[in-house]
C-alpha cells in the first residue's frame, strides 16, 4: 500500500524534499560601489531583506515614535508629513496605524521597568505609563504604498501603552513600539 503511494506521487514527494531557493542580490549588491554609506546599506537590507527585522535601537525609536518637540501636534498634516519624512512603512507598504509620543527616550526606557499590562489585543506584554502624555494617533485614510500614504491626524492625551524587548547585550528591557494611547479617567 505504502509503496504504491510513493510510486504514484513520486513527483510531489520530490518537490517536498527540495530546498527553498535563496534570493539573489539584496543590499549587498550595492556594496561594490564603494561610495554608499553603511547606514544606507543597512536600510536597504532591512527593506529588501528576507530575514527577521533587527532589534530596535535608541536611534530607531527616536526616529519612529518620538514626536518633534518644536512642531505642534494639532497640525492637520502632522501624520502624513512625518510618516513620509521618517520613512515609517513596512517594505514600502503603508502602515495602517502609528503613534508619535511627546516624551523622551529615557522616559520610554523607564516605562519598560514598570509592571506588565494588557495590550490592546489582550496579550500581557505591554507597559502602561503612570502619567498622562501627549501624542498623535495616525490613521491611514488613503493609499497602500509609499509615497501615496495619507493619514488622519488625531491628537490624544492619555496613558501610553508601549511594548518592550529584552536586549541581551545590556541585559535590560528597551522600548520596542507604541501599542496605544489609552484615555483613562
Sequence positions of predicted segments:
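N-terminal "domain-start" segment
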Residues: 2-127
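Short, structured protein-protein interaction patches enriched in aromatics and acidic/basic residues
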Residues: 121-141
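Compact beta-sheet-dominated globular domain cores
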Residues: 141-185
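Ordered, helix-dominated protein-protein interaction surfaces in large eukaryotic regulatory proteins
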Residues: 3-4, 110, 140, 164-166
Amino acid at each position: 500500500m505504502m509503496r504504491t503511494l510513493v510510486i504514484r506521487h513520486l513527483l510531489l514527494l520530490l518537490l517536498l524534499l527540495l530546498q527553498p531557493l535563496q534570493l539573489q542580490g539584496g543590499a549587498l549588491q550595492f556594496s561594490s560601489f564603494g561610495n554608499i554609506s553603511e547606514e544606507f546599506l543597512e536600510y536597504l537590507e532591512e527593506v529588501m531583506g528576507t530575514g527577521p527585522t533587527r532589534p530596535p535601537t535608541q536611534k530607531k525609536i527616536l526616529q519612529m515614535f518620538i514626536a518633534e518637540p518644536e512642531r505642534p501636534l494639532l497640525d492637520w498634516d502632522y501624520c502624513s508629513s512625518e510618516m513620509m519624512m521618517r520613512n515609517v512603512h513596512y517594505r514600502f507598504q503603508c502602515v495602517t496605524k502609528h503613534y508619535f509620543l511627546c516624551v523622551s527616550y529615557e522616559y520610554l526606557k523607564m516605562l519598560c521597568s514598570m509592571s506588565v499590562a494588557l495590550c490592546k489585543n489582550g496579550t500581557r506584554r505591554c507597559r502602561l505609563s503612570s502619567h498622562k502624555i501627549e501624542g498623535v494617533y495616525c490613521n491611514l485614510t488613503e493609499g497602500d504604498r509609499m509615497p501615496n500614504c495619507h493619514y488622519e491626524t488625531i491628537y490624544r492625551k492619555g496613558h501610553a501603552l508601549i511594548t518592550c524587548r529584552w536586549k541581551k547585550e545590556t541585559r535590560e528591557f528597551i522600548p520596542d513600539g507604541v501599542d496605544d494611547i489609552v484615555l483613562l479617567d
